C-alpha cells in the first residue's frame, strides 16, 4: 500500500534527521514513530467503520483489527480530531531538527535529506491521501482530513 510505504519513508527520514542532531534522539524518534502508529490504531482506528476491512485508506483496517476491537457507534470525526495530534511529532520534530541542521551544520547531504523528508511528509503523503487512498472512502464526509473546513466548524 503506497500510504504505508510513504509513512515508513517519512519515519526513517525523520529518524535520520533527528539522529544527526543527537543519536539517542534519532533512536527515540524511531521508537515514537512506531508507537504512534499503534496508538493511532488504538485511539482512532477502533472507531472507524473500516476496521477489519481492506477498504481502509491508510491500510491499517485489517492490521489494527488484529490487536484492537472496534467501538461501533462512535463519532469518528470527533475522535479523529481529538487524537490525531499523536502523529504531529512524527512530522514536526524531524522538521525542526532539519531546520536546526541546515542552520548549524549546513551540508549538501543534510539539505537533500531534509528536502526528501519535506517532499515525502508534506507533499507525497497528503497527495496519496487526498487523491488515492481517501478518494473513494465512504467516510470522507465524516473525516476531518478530507473535509477539514467543515469539520473544524462542526467540532
Task: Give the residues covered by each predicted segment.
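Hydrophobic alpha-helical membrane-embedded segments
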Residues: 23-51, 120-129
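Short membrane-interface loop/juxtamembrane segments of multi-pass integral membrane proteins
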Residues: 56-82
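Alpha-helical transmembrane segments and their immediate juxtamembrane interface regions
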Residues: 106-148
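Long, highly hydrophobic alpha-helical transmembrane signal-anchor segments
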Residues: 1-36, 87-119
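Membrane-cytosol interface motif
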Residues: 53-63, 142-150
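Polar-ligand-bearing catalytic/cofactor-coordination segments
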Residues: 155
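Short cysteine clusters
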Residues: 45-51, 56, 134-137, 143
